[in-house]
Amino acid sequence: MGNRQIGFQTMSDVACRPPWWRRSLLPFLSGVLSVILLLVIAYFGVRKFGTGGRLPERQPKTEAELAAGFSAGAQDEAAANRADIAWQVETLYARQQLDPNATLDFLLLSGGGDHAAFGAGFLSGWASVEGKNAMPKFDGVSGVSAGALIAPFAFLGTPEALEAINRLVRDPKPDWVVPRGLFFFLPENASFADVPGLMRDLCAEVDLNFAERIVRASTGGKRVLLIQATDADLGTGRTFDAVAAARQAVATGDPDILRNILLASAAVPGAFPPREIEGRLYMDGSITSNFYYGDPTDEGQSFGAVWRREHPDAPIPKTRYWLVINEYIRPAPVTLQPKWLAIVERSIYMSVRSSEMIALRHLYAIAEATKLRGGGEVEVRWVAVPQTWKTTKVGYFDKEKMRELSDEGRRLGADPQAWMTKAP
C-alpha cells in the first residue's frame, strides 16, 4: 500500500525527525554565543578605545620614595600646625586687649553626601540669629567630603555666601552624578559614575572672584580654611590649606587649583573619580575621618602651653568647637534583609556613623584633658540631623529630599537651643 502521507511528509519522515526542543537548541545556542561574542568584542573595544572614564597610567614609586613622602608630609603638617597655633595665640591676645571675653572659634563641617543640604540650611538659619547667640566670625573652618563643598562659603560667612551654597544644594541637577554607561564596571575606570553637573555648578560658584574673596576673608592669614582629603598613595589623611590654594589660584589665574581640592575631598571611592594633586591620588576625606578637628600636638606645643609661655600674666581664652554633622549621629533602625548587598551597604554606613561618634567622644576627651592640664577651657557643641527626621524620598541627590533637609537645617539653625553640649 505504501507509506501513508501527511501533507508532503511520510510517516517515516516524521518518525525520523528530532524532537522540537533539539531543533530549537542549536539556533538558541548560536544566538547566545553571538551575543556573548558581541559583548566580548565590545568589552575589549571599550578597553582599547573608550578611555573616557580613565585617568592616565601613573608611574609607580618605590617604597623608599613613598616612605620619604610620608615623612615629609608629616613634618610639613606638624610645622603648619605649630605656625597656626602661633598666630592663634598672637591674634587672640590682641583681640583680648579689646574684649576680655574674646574666644577662639572653630566650625567643623562633616561629610554626609546629599545630606550636606542639612548643614547648608543650618548655617543659613544660624545667620539669621542676632545677639549673644549669633554666628561668630570663625577663626578656622574645616570641611570633609560634602562638608568640604560647604566650608568655603561658611568661611566667607556673609548672608549672601551662605544663601548661595544653600541655594545650590536645594537645586541638584539630574547630571550632578551620571553613570559611565553600559561598561561602567570596567576595572580600568576611575569610577563607575562621573560628576559633570556637579563640577559645572561648583565651577560657576568657585571662580577667580570667589578665590579672591577667600584670600581677603583670611585677613592676612589670621583665619584658616582647612579641607581634608585622603591620600590614597600614603594611606593617610591630608589637610589642605584652602586659603593658600586660593592665593595660588589668584596668582596663576587658575581656580582649578582650589576646585580640585574640594572635589578630591568629596570623591566617594568607586562612585566619583579621584583627583591627582601634586603627584598623589586623593579621594574622599571621610575615609580617614568624617570631620577634622586638628592633628595630634605635643603638650609643649599646644595652644595653652604656647599661651602660657608668651603671655603668662593673661588668662587663657576659651576655645569653642561648633560641629555640624550632616547625618544622623546614630544609624536609623531598620529591619535588614539577609541579602549580601544590603548587608554590605548597612555595614559601611554603620562603620562611618560609629567612627564619627568615637571621634566626637575623643574631642570631648581632649577638651576635658586640656582643662585638667591648665590649658584653658574648651567647649564642644554639635548638631546633627534629628533622629526623628524621616523622608520617603530615595535616590542620591533627590531634589525633594535635599530641600526637606535644607528646611530642617534652617529651622534648627535659627534655634539656639538646637546645639548639643554633651558627648553622645
Tell where the protein language model's regions lie, with residue ranges.
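Patatin-like phospholipase
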Residues: 2-139, 155-424
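Hydrolases whose catalytic domains are alpha/beta-hydrolase-1, hotdog thioesterase
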Residues: 150-153
